[in-house]
């Protein structure tokens, strides 16, 4: 089945240890994948996302181990934030956008 009027955008984001917004890319769907050689975890969530800390809270992001991925239907990557356990925890993305 052909997908018409679609553009694919992909990239890599280096690991950061403070909550950081993803790029401003309008999209319909995005797949985020933790790099295969990441030593620890990447967390994906909303503004103010935090790492898992062993307590109940409303800010801990979805944890991605090395090679794990998540696909979301979302209107813009910039609605998501990431935080990593270490600066070596990189994240890749591939987003489906409407072609202009």
List the model feature ranges, each with a label.
Residues 2-26:
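Surface-exposed ligand/attachment interfaces on beta-rich extracellular proteins
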Residues 7, 18-21, 32, 51, ...:
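N-terminal compositionally biased, intrinsically disordered segments and leader/signal-like regions
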Residues 10, 45, 65:
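Residue-level detector of conserved, well-ordered beta-strand and adjacent loop positions
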Residues 25-37:
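Forkhead-associated
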Residues 28-30, 72-89:
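Noncatalytic modules at the cell exterior or secretory-pathway interfaces
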Residues 35-56, 92-94:
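Short, surface-exposed beta-strand/strand-loop-strand elements in extracellular ectodomains
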Residues 61-77:
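Beta-sandwich interaction modules
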Residues 84, 90-100:
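Low-complexity intrinsically disordered segments
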């Amino acid at each position: 089945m052909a997908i018409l009027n679609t553009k694919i955008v992909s990239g890599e984001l280096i690991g950061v240890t403070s909550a950081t917004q993803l790029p401003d890319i309008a999209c319909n769907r995005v797949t985020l994948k933790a790099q295969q050689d990441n030593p620890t975890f990447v967390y994906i969530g909303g503004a103010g996302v935090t790492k898992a800390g062993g307590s109940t809270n409303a800010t801990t992001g979805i944890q991605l181990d090395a090679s794990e991925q998540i696909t979301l239907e979302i209107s813009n990557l910039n609605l998501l934030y990431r935080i990593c356990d270490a600066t070596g925890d990189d994240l890749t993305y591939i987003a489906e956008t409407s072609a202009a």
